[in-house]
Amino acid sequence: QSGLDYLEWFAEEAKRIYGDVIPGHMSDKRLIVIKQPVGVTAAITPWNFPHSMISRKAGPALAAGCPMIVKPAMETPFSALAMAYLAQQAGVPDGIYSVVTGDPVAIGGEMTTNAMVKKISFTGSTRVGKILMKQCADTVKKMSMELGGNAPFIVFDDADIDAAVTGAMMSKYRNSGQTCVCANRLFVQAGVYEAFSQKLAEQVRAIKVGNGLEAGVAQGPLISQAAANNAEALVNDAKDKGATVLCGGQRVDADANFFAPTILTDVNKDMRIASEEIFAPIAPIFKFETDEEAIALANDTEYGLAGYFYSRDIGRVWRIAE
């Protein structure tokens, strides 16, 4: 549904692509800005939301009058191909919405170096984003990028704990923790640390893992064996450095990619899980004492994208937000 919502939104917004009239340096002159299509655009999309991420990129491009070439993730090509088929059935002219699948290095290299492509939109890792930016430099392409995330989730001692637990469930375990805006590091003030951890654990233990087509199942597998192996490695590293597994902590099936929804307590910043993007249903909970400590911990990352915090003190809300 979110993919359809994107298309509808951008189709309507295309009616409001306004220009600007800017006062000139002389009283009898006006500067007029008219927005026009940039030209052929390309999108490199991730696997975690294979339909909606394409709609989010192709929707505004097509609405603005720009042909779009999509390279979907190798793990999830079928959504893009199905959209190409539907576009053809709907009467979209050939060449306006195109899909290319295959070797990501070769396709990405062509997109970044071909002078016909005027703009690239990419969602993925920071490492790959840097490579694409370097490759685009020779043709000075416009770029829009959404890169890796390491979102902090802060719970202050005056927060509504039940609301914070509900928020953590939504922002951490959605899509098995495989979103770039997932809560990656949970910082909880000492006064409510135990209460929050136990209430969250009650909710997490109730998550049913399995086939997403079965009734009651809320979490499916991770995208690949490599992803499950990485989740396992992060938990083991944290345990080796003193973390406590409050729940989960291992694969549901040793031969599959289902990973149990996990909570780690007694976490510290020396653990890999404190600095790496997790992309798994693992919630590491850090304890803090003061507002200043929470801000320092939250900002101690090279990533961005999102942040969450819970408090009922309006002064604290503004101070932390700013």
Language-model features, listed with the residues they occupy:
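Conserved C-terminal structural/oligomerization subdomain of aldehyde/semialdehyde dehydrogenase
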Residues: V117, I154, K208, N236, ...
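Structural detector of well-ordered beta-strand residues that form the stable sheet scaffold
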Residues: I69, S98, S144, L246, ...
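Rossmann-like NAD(P) dinucleotide-binding subdomain of oxidoreductase/dehydrogenase enzymes
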Residues: Y6-W9, G19-A163, F288
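Thr-Gly-centered strand-to-loop micro-motif
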Residues: A64, V70-K71, F122-T123, C182-A183, ...
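Residue-level signal for inorganic ion chemistry
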Residues: L7, G65, Y97, I120, ...
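Conserved sugar-transfer catalytic core signal across GT-A, GT-B, and GT-C glycosyltransferases
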Residues: R56-A58, L234, R316
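ALDH superfamily catalytic-core signature
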Residues: K119, R127-N268, L297
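Well-formed, non-transmembrane alpha-helical positions, independent of function
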Residues: P60, E110-M111, G167, D237, ...
